[in-house]
């Protein structure tokens, strides 16, 4: 079997939900791809004050994306920084924690279990909206590194995934991103990118790759991977003389903190299967056009997926897995004066660039 099917799988996994501040809709579709490698998590109530949303686009396999959808939010929850109210540092640490957890005997066992579960469902789409009260919840000892067995020296998976995560607490929005999935906010109808795509052509990414001993060929790291930050991909993280953030490929996320205001309409997180077909502003315009016509936000997401699906595999665009999470803000968001997008940043963590979508064509 090649990377594409003879006919696309257009059945979708869709969900809706809401709390007193937010409305949620999401949808995912396998499309033309031979396997579904996307995963997502959506928790309107991570705790009594905080919501968590994430999109994870797998490559080379799907288990790392599934692993992150299952465990990343719980690592945010159990962080001391999270308890202290520092969401940016908490989610930043959780990205690196995913790589740590996937090593050793326990990591091998968890990835194997996820792989078996995926294989048993025979390629059907599995919705991954996980409860924070799962097996790796905020309680109990974090004993992953202490489990021993025949795979104690397991270095971690060679496949990987992007991770684009948003946390919302009161009027604060925190976005963390590694890879080329993207988070976009609509403010008064204008699309603003709250993450940047980590690609080899970026100078800072290229410099890190070369200094770590890698190279770029035909737009790909070591002729293989076409993005520069990801969770997993352990073959690119083997330099024992470098910290995790300086490896050829790193899970180090850009962190962006935004103060929400009443001009904010909605937030979108989506994998590159969407962004390869629509610019940020085109997607925002499409959502505004359909959000009043459809009965639910998930129906709007389904419209987007159908809009992006290619009629054939000729050309490549519109042939990828597609996942989209749409979060609508209930008004009023705040009684405070209008805030500037990106006016706050997390201390000690690089702030992602935020550009009006039409400025960079994305």
Curated annotation (Swiss-Prot):
Residues 23-329 form the PPM-type phosphatase domain. Mn(2+) 2 binds at residues 57, 272, 320. The lineage of its organism: Eukaryota, Viridiplantae, Streptophyta, Embryophyta, Tracheophyta. The keyword Transmembrane does not apply. GO terms for biological process: signal transduction. Pfam families: PP2C. The keyword Hydrolase applies. Keywords: Hydrolase, Magnesium, Manganese, Metal-binding, Protein phosphatase. Gene3D superfamilies: PPM-type phosphatase domain. Binds 2 magnesium or manganese ions per subunit. It catalyses: O-phospho-L-seryl-[protein] + H2O = L-seryl-[protein] + phosphate; O-phospho-L-threonyl-[protein] + H2O = L-threonyl-[protein] + phosphate. Mn(2+) 1 binds at residues 57-58. Belongs to the PP2C family. It comes from the Eukaryota. Its EC number is 3.1.3.16. This is Probable protein phosphatase 2C 11.
């Amino acid at each position: 079997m090649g990377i594409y099917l003879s006919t696309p799988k257009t059945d979708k996994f869709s969900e809706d939900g809401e709390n007193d501040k937010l409305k949620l809709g999401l949808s995912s579709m396998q499309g033309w791809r031979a396997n579904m490698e996307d995963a997502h998590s959506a928790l309107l109530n991570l705790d009594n004050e905080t919501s968590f949303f994430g999109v994870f686009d797998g490559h080379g396999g799907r288990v790392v994306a599934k692993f992150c959808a299952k465990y990343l939010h719980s690592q945010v929850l159990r962080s001391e920084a999270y308890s202290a109210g520092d969401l940016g540092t908490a989610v930043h640490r959780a990205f690196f924690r995913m790589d740590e957890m996937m090593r050793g005997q326990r990591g091998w066992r968890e990835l194997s279990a996820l792989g078996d579960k995926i294989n048993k469902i025979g390629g059907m789409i599995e919705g991954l909206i996980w409860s924070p009260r799962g097996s790796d919840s905020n309680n109990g000892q974090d004993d992953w590194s202490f489990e021993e067995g025949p795979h104690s020296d397991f270095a971690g998976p060679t496949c990987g995934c992007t991770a684009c995560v948003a946390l919302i607490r009161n009027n604060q929005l925190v976005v963390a991103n590694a890879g080329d999935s993207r988070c976009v906010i609509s403010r008064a109808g204008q699309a603003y990118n709250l993450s940047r795509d980590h690609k080899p052509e970026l100078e800072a990414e290229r410099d890190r790759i070369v200094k770590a001993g890698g190279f770029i060929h035909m737009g790909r790291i070591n002729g293989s991977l076409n993005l520069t930050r990801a969770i997993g991909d352990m073959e690119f993280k083997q330099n024992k003389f470098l910290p995790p953030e300086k490896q050829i490929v790193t899970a180090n996320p850009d962190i962006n903190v935004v103060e929400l205001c009443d001009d904010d309409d909605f937030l979108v997180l989506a994998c590159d299967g969407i962004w390869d077909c629509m610019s940020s502003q085109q997607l925002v315009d499409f959502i505004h056009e359909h959000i009043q016509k459809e009965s639910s936000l998930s129906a709007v997401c389904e419209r987007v997926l159908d809009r992006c699906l290619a009629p054939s595999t000729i050309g490549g665009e519109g042939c990828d897995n597609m996942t989209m999470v749409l979060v609508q803000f209930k008004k009023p968001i705040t009684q405070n004066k209008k805030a500037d997008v990106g006016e706050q940043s997390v201390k000690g963590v690089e702030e992602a660039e935020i550009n009006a979508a039409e400025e960079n064509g994305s």
